Swiss-Prot record:
Disulfide bonds join 166-190, 180-241, 232-245, 338-459, 370-380, 453-463, 535-546. This is Hemagglutinin-neuraminidase. Its EC number is 3.2.1.18. The keyword DNA damage does not apply. It comes from the Viruses. GO terms for cellular component: host cell plasma membrane; membrane; viral envelope; virion membrane. Residues 228-233 are annotated as: Important for neuraminidase activity. Gene3D superfamilies: 1.20.5.110, 2.120.10.10. Keywords: Disulfide bond, Glycoprotein, Hemagglutinin, Host cell membrane, Host membrane, Host-virus interaction, Hydrolase, Membrane, Signal-anchor, Transmembrane, Transmembrane helix, Viral attachment to host cell, Viral envelope protein, Virion, Virus entry into host cell. Residues 47-571 are virion surface. Residues 228-233 are annotated as: Involved in neuraminidase activity. The keyword Nuclease does not apply.
Amino acid sequence: MEDYSNLSLKSIPKRTCRIIFRTATILGICTLIVLCSSILHEIIHLDVSSGLMDSDDSQQGIIQPIIESLKSLIALANQILYNVAIIIPLKIDSIETVIFSALKDMHTGSMSNTNCTPGNLLLHDAAYINGINKFLVLKSYNGTPKYGPLLNIPSFIPSATSPNGCTRIPSFSLIKTHWCYTHNVMLGDCLDFTTSNQYLAMGIIQQSAAAFPIFRTMKTIYLSDGINRKSCSVTAIPGGCVLYCYVATRSEKEDYATTDLAELRLAFYYYNDTFIERVISLPNTTGQWATINPAVGSGIYHLGFILFPVYGGLISGTPSYNKQSSRYFIPKHPNITCAGNSSEQAAAARSSYVIRYHSNRLIQSAVLICPLSDMHTARCNLVMFNNSQVMMGAEGRLYVIDNNLYYYQRSSSWWSASLFYRINTDFSKGIPPIIEAQWVPSYQVPRPGVMPCNATSFCPANCITGVYADVWPLNDPEPTSQNALNPNYRFAGAFLRNESNRTNPTFYTASASALLNTTGFNNTNHKAAYTSSTCFKNTGTQKIYCLIIIEMGSSLLGEFQIIPFLRELIP
């Protein structure tokens, strides 16, 4: 029986069809231009002596048919352009959905009667395939999206099973065919360097009998091999998942103090149970970076590359440090007046990247870039963000939405609102020298933090605080001009609604300037930590759903339990 387990979008030759059709169209248009030129040439060189041009009537008799022919040719060219630009791409998307659906039906139907287990194709229900990693409402939408009630779904996230256990650091990645998920299982307590194992799973979205989505786990692997993987980030790729971790042998503070880089590991886990793990060595990092950490949030698969968000500490006096130390980003809140003049504020913003607590390292954000074709080698590169465009390095997440790249950065420094950027770097030409980003102006949502960088802080200061709480953009956040607020931008997720403590997890929808809709739990003092949100659409019913994963405090089994919450989002 044919194996569909490694099915990917690349297996459908839609790009080839588009290239052939567009080439033929261009050739056709060129032919029309040549014909038109030839006709005009003949008109100019008509033989007057022949008597054909002796009267206005005879001239009209010759020119009129030519004009009518030209009109027909122009109309034909316009129709061809319309078909290429609009009709053909829509039909290709429709055909793609039909093919995926047919493959799934075939695999779970008659073929399952022979050698296959029903439902074993790693592919979402057809209703969700084209509603993933898309903007879910129009760019012009300016309404107030609201959440429906919590939907009772079976949890795909296993919890701790002993009072001393702890599950933490969830990472979730969703692509058109399947999802990948991972978290850390700490065996004693919730300290960063406690001995731990790593849980990794992949699965699909299915439609429940109640007509809402459920997350079905198809494969799991529990990495319990004595390797203390930490801060892991996951990325879904065609046919499987990639896990990026560092190996902890000391505390985070000790990691920054030393110049001996911790071991970095990249693991490939495929639906056919293949598991390949490599220790990676990054060029131009030894002696320049004190520590390199996966940024927890999920990475992306883009143009043949696997990209993971990264942060760490640059060593003073090194080329990388010197390159970035003069750069700083200083967003402004229109309703906040900060102390000091502009020069003093700029100096405070520049110094906010260097943290005394972390041995005066410059805390830097970056992207790990690995060609998927080289998964059997350890060839990857680390590319830094331009610090003139992003805040101090922190945990983060990468997104591909409607073929655009975005980056969420945890607000660990003085700016308390969520940080979201458009990545403007072109990866089609290979690995870039630096990552260029454009901030999406927003003054929401806040996160708890210590003074002087608490939830209402918007003035430059030196601190490292906050909590990871990524956002999901519901429509295109593109500003109308550089650093101008987009009044129609809408996003969703969950945050900890407290000035300084990690308590009161709250679901929200927001614009760039205001919280639009919030709903929390009865106990506003309930302990919580990281939150991660992913929204998608059922293209059959046009309903939008948001999966919001929250580290919830537990008083019974472990300090934290990771809970997936599913809600319908009503525009």
